[in-house]
Amino acid sequence: MAAPAAGSGPGGSSGGITGGAGGSLGVVGPSTSTSSVNPFLSDSEEEEDGGEEEEEEEEDDNEEDDEDVSPLNERPAASLASRYLQDEADSTLLPSAGPRLCLQPGEPGRVPLDAVAAQLLRDQLLLTALELHTELLESGRELPRLRDYFSNPGNFERATAAPPGFGGNTTASTGGQLNRAGSISTLDSLDFARYSDDGNRETDERVAENEVPLQERKNYKSSPEIQEPIKPLEKRALNFLVNEYLLKNNNKLTSITFSDENDDQDFELWDDVGLNTPKPPDLLQLYRNLSNHQTVSKDVADIAVGVIEGDLEPIQAVKQIAPDSHISQQAAIIKELEDKIILCNNEKAALLEQIGNLERQIESLQKENSASGVCSAAPPTSDRLQSQTSEESDHYIDIQITDSDAKCEGTEERLPFQQSECEPVCQVSEDIPPSPELAKIRKTTLLSAPPSKAGVHFDKPNRKLSPAFHQALLSFCRMSADSRLGSEVSQIADSENGVMKMLGRCLPHIVPNVLLAKREELIPLILCTACLHPESKERDQLLHILFNLIKRPDDEQRQMILTGCVAFARHVGPTRVEAELLPQCWEQINHKYPERRLLVAESCGDLAPYLPKEIRSSLVLAMLQQMLMEDKADMVREAVIKSLGIIMGYIDDPDKYSQGFELLLTALGDPSERVVSATHQVFLPAYAAWTMELGNLQSHLIPTLLSKIEKLLKEGEHGLDEHKLHMYLSALQSLIPSLFATVLQNAPFTSKAKLQGEVPQIEVTRFPRPVSPLQDVATIIGSREQLAVLLQLYDYQLEHEGTTGWESLLWVVNQLLPQLIEIVGRITVTSTASVHEFSRFFWRLCRTFGKIFTNTKVKPQFQEILRLSEENIDSTAGNGVLTKATVPIYATGVLTCYNQEEDRKLLVGFLEDVMTMLSLSHAPLDSLKASFVELGTNPAYHELLLTVLWYGVVHTSALVRCTAARMFELLVKGVNETLVAQRVVPALITLSSDPEISVRIATVPAFGTIMETVTQRELLERVKMQLASFLEDPQYQDQHSLQTEIIRTFGRVGPNAEPRFRDDFVLPHLHKLSFVNNQQSVDSKRLDIATHLFEAYSALSCCFISEELMMNHFLPGLRCLRTDMEQLSPEHEVILSSMIKECEQKVENKTVQEPQGSMSIAASLVSEDTKTKFLNKMGQLTTSGAMLANVFQRKK
């Protein structure tokens, strides 16, 4: 069992026992407990020492480092030895000798009890000493020596090299440790008491209570070492050893359960326990080596002054009183040594004063040269060393501190006997309440605040970004200063005084929280120390701890770490950021936990403003590119994209433009939607801003994306890759705000745009809602006020002065728009997704560039292409452009961007003209259908579309009326039932009585769609009556096209229609049509009807059909259809035969199951009764196995 750490005992001072007889007076080996009692000190000396120990007790109790150093006062050894030898000879020299009895001349010699106790302890006669202590305690004459010895549990935890009586020639090399008391050196009382699983670490009940007094056990239980909670490192190490032991002994299930209960630890790697932590032997080896366990000696040990055994006379020799001459000689030696001490102290004071003067000169020079990158961390030591003079103890050796760079912590380790300088500073800062202004710090203040340390300069990019765009770009940095801890992190100090104040504010929060996984509380301390520490190796270690502080940091914890990194960078400058922070990022770029890689990706963007410009465009860009290409986690790549956007706001090397473009294409093609979204929100706008400055937006970026779309259309003649088309087109759409900003910034009126007088207001709906602040035109320009002035001049210029000399706008009008319209004409109109994407693009383009631009520049170019006039109608081939995607994109993307009355009239007129021209030219209606489908998704256009269709219903041409009837089928699905009842059904009823049979036939699909979607019974009855008239009116008996259309409609809507409509109307009429088709004499018509009937029956076979309908209509209809297929299509006849057989089996199964159903009811009742009786009998049994077995015996 490990001994208590030096310096951590209750006393806090160091003590020890001099080993071996042959040694000289001097330093004793390492002590296992700082509160050990030196049996060679007198009572008065112990009291002095104890007083000093009490002053240091609180500080030493909290010390967790096992490497504390306790240097001792350099007091001449002879002084202490002579004082002890004079105890009985001259009581006048040492009046405070405690309970010793001075010998008077002529009296027989009497041994002092204190000397007896010292001898017993030295000879390890502990039981005798304990008995003596008990008797003295009962008589009221307690010896401090025995009291202190037995109250210190550390004296009973030392391993023994040999039992008492063996190896009596113990030397100083053994450390002078006391041997273990045999009564408690047992396994159960020692190791289980300290290393039990009990969270309170209380002493095991199996300690030999009869051999240890009650007070000793109480002291032992209340020892700080026992009550100290287990450290995280200790817990992980023990968990690992326990799991390893379980696996070696094939306790795999127990190991799995143990691993699940400790899921925060990786049991496969020892390195997960702790960095640079050596792995101990397994549990079995530790148990076997328990008897040989000894306290591990430390590199720097506690030191005490002792006396060689040879200098102590045996008890019998004490009776021999030394002669007076010898006493006077010893007194002279003591006086001489004391004079030397006084001289040394005087010399030390002079040197300290000289050191103080030199340090003040150094501090003044450092203030003058504050532009240096590394803050000087040498603490002033003059006050600290001067306080040593007044507080040093007589029992220790004087230690001269010559290292002017010693840290306050290091001094505390070397000088435990003096009050540390840090403690009073922290104590004072605790009395000062934190400023309430710290809680009001916001992220914008943190981002825009200049460096708080004079002389720190950062590379400013040679860019022309507006401050608003710059601020919006930096808003994506993952920082937070809106909380107490965020304020602490962002306000790190740059001087020793500031560090001390920070410690005073943060320590009260760290102490209660650090054991509850609140490790982010440590970030201010780590950062302050890393900022001010003079040694680069120590700074690297601290930053490594910062990045590894939390195993898997969540979003809030990452924000705290990144906020601290930015504050650190603002204080130390770009050189140290490059040398110290970036290597930490590089180390974790391939970490197994995505949260760590996410921290790296976010830090690259947050640190971008504080890095040298060469590093931004080389190392950091390469790191982010590697993570974008290789990382498999979507959230990591998303953070990479945002950091790339921030980097793009600071790169000013034109050679990196092409690399940025390749990264942009890679990001746009990422399979993760969140990565693509981050690209449109951050990366693309930031890259576009750089492209604008380089003048490449209109010369390279947009033309390149357009050429890729054209290439895609050429390669996709047999199948368009809609995903890539969406990727490039969405990128163009995100570039529209940047393109408009370029047009405004390069306009002829730019010099006139000055903020004077009242600034005009921008309409709320003037621009489409941006998906990101970086796509807001006002942000790109600089402010809404500046944009308002530019817009006013822009509209005036377009309306009155034109575009002469306006190169950027002329490029849009003369190159961009014609190329886009040409691309639109090559889009397949049946590709709904492509039509929708281009419609959104033109809608945003027109809304961004304004109504005047749309009316004067965009619409004329479309109208020139479409040429909507009756003289252009070609009845043989039709108008080719009207059948392309140009029609729906113009209608839904351009004509709908403004919703005033005149705009709606223009849209209605355009759709009416298209419907008329397509109908009269017998052209396909796909373009018109695409327009209706796209507009029908918005309920605001339903009335408008019904107006267009009513125009077709009352048109003089039967072709137009027929087209209107077919368009109703598309509109019914999205229109509410009120409009269907008021507008759609009356129009269809009108068309169903049209003189032209083709018009009447065209209404059938629309009636069928109503039956499929509407739930109002009145409407359904009206539709049912109209369809019945088509089927039963003799004038339609020979209308082959009508019959075909009705059968096709039944097959489409039958499975989704109301069951009553399907059972009462659809199936009986299909049976009738199948029977009539058997008498058809024309084979072509007979086969056409039969084919449509086969498709309708195949669709309806999946529906539930009652037995009556199956027998009366479904099966007879299938048999009639099989008769047709036997003669006309044998391949269909095989399928029909299997369908008929399957239906017949279903009917037979239902017939057979009916009588079985009544029997099954009776059987279920019997089984329930049997089950009840069985359970009742089972409940009457006891747990006897024999009685339970009797239940299942056969009756005889």
From Swiss-Prot:
Residues 195-219 have a biased composition (Basic and acidic residues). InterPro entries: ARM-like (IPR011989), ARM-type_fold (IPR016024), HEAT_type_2 (IPR021133), LisH (IPR006594), RELCH (IPR040362). Residues 8-26 have a biased composition (Gly residues). Residues 43-69 have a biased composition (Acidic residues). GO terms for cellular component: recycling endosome; trans-Golgi network. May regulate intracellular cholesterol transport. Residues 27-37 have a biased composition (Low complexity). Residues 169-180 have a biased composition (Polar residues). It is found in: Recycling endosome; Golgi apparatus, trans-Golgi network. This is RAB11-binding protein RELCH homolog. Transmembrane segments: none annotated. GO terms for biological process: intracellular cholesterol transport. Residues 333-374 form a coiled coil. HEAT repeats lie at residues 620-659, 984-1022.
